[in-house]
Regions:
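Phosphate-/nucleic-acid-contacting segments
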Residues: 167-232
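Cyclic-nucleotide recognition modules
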Residues: 28, 34, 78-135, 142
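Short phosphate-coordinating micro-motif centered on Lys-Gly-acidic
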Residues: 45-52
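A cytosolic small-molecule/anion-sensing beta-strand core signal
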Residues: 42, 60-61, 83, 107
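Glycine- and acidic-residue-biased ligand/ion/polar-headgroup-sensing regions
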Residues: 54-67, 84-85
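Short alpha-helix-to-loop micro-motif enriched in aromatics/charged/Gly
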Residues: 72-77
Length: 232
C-alpha cells in the first residue's frame, strides 16, 4: 500500500465529481480536497475494518471487493464490488462500530483517504452531506435486499443470469465490472461455488446465451438470458 501526501488534479476532480461533494463551492472543495491523501493498493492487497475504521476512502479507479469469510471452511461471500466514486467504510463513519468485514483489491486500486473524524466534522458542518450519505446507504441496502430475494426465490442459474444482466452494457452486449473475474469470484457474488458456476456457464454457452473466451464474456442471446433470470 502506497501513500502520497496531498491530492493532485485527479484527486480534486474525484472530490468535486463525487455524489457527496458535487456542487459544493470551489473554495470549500479546495479545503476538503486538501485533507485527503492518495493511496495506491497493488492488486490483491487485503485489509479489514479494524485496520481501516479510522479512515474514510473514495475510490478513484479499480475494483475493491468487500467480503466476509468463514474461517472454518474458507468460503467467502462478497457483499459489494466497489468501483470508481464508491466510498467506504460507511458503517464505521456513522456508527463507529467495528464490524467483521474484509477488503481486497482485485487489481491496482487508487483511492483518496481522510481521517474518519474529519469526515464526521464535515457531516456536522455541511448538512447536505448527510442527505447524500443516506441516499448512498439506501442504494447499498437495496443491493443487499436484492441478494436476499434472489437467494430465497431463485435457483443458481437464475441468480447467475441476474448478475450478468446487472452488469451488462446493453449497447455493446458485453459485461462490465465482472467480465474478467474468475468463476470463484463470481460464485462469491451469488452464494455458490466455483464448480457450480463453471457448470452453469458451460450450459449457457451450449444453449447459445453466452460467448465465452479467455477472461471475456459476451451475451449473444438476450431474450434467452432474460428467460433464465426468471427461473424458467
Amino acid at each position: 500500500m502506497k501513500l502520497k501526501g496531498g491530492v493532485n488534479g485527479i484527486g480534486y476532480n474525484t472530490i468535486s465529481n463525487n455524489i457527496l461533494f458535487k456542487d459544493f463551492e470551489q473554495n470549500i472543495l479546495s479545503e476538503i480536497a486538501s485533507n485527503f491523501v492518495e493511496e495506491i493498493w497493488p492488486a490483491h492487497t487485503c485489509s479489514n475494518c479494524e485496520n481501516l475504521k479510522h479512515k474514510f476512502h473514495i475510490i478513484i479507479s479499480g475494483r475493491l471487493k468487500v467480503f466476509q469469510t468463514d474461517k472454518e471452511t474458507g468460503r467467502e461471500f462478497t457483499l459489494f464490488l466497489l468501483t470508481k466514486n464508491d466510498f467506504f467504510d460507511v458503517i464505521s463513519l456513522v456508527d463507529g462500530c467495528n464490524h467483521k468485514i474484509y477488503y481486497e483489491s482485485l487489481e491496482e486500486v487508487k483511492m483518496l483517504s481522510t481521517a474518519t473524524f474529519t469526515m464526521r466534522k464535515w457531516l456536522k458542518t455541511y448538512p447536505k452531506l448527510n442527505e447524500r450519505l443516506l441516499s448512498y446507504i439506501g442504494k447499498q441496502l437495496l443491493r443487499v435486499e436484492d441478494y436476499a430475494v434472489n437467494h430465497t426465490f431463485f435457483e443458481i442459474p437464475a441468480r447467475l443470469a441476474r448478475l450478468i444482466l446487472e452488469n451488462l452494457n446493453h449497447k455493446s452486449q458485453k459485461l462490465e465490472y465482472i467480465n474478467d473475474l474468475s468463476n470463484e469470484e463470481i460464485a462469491n457474488l451469488i452464494g455458490s461455488t466455483r464448480a457450480v458456476v463453471n457448470r452453469h456457464f458451460q450450459d449457457f454457452k451450449k444453449e447459445g446465451i453466452l460467448k465465452i473466451s479467455r477472461k471475456k464474456m459476451e451475451v449473444i442471446n438476450l431474450p434467452l438470458l432474460l428467460k433464465k433470470a426468471t427461473n424458467e
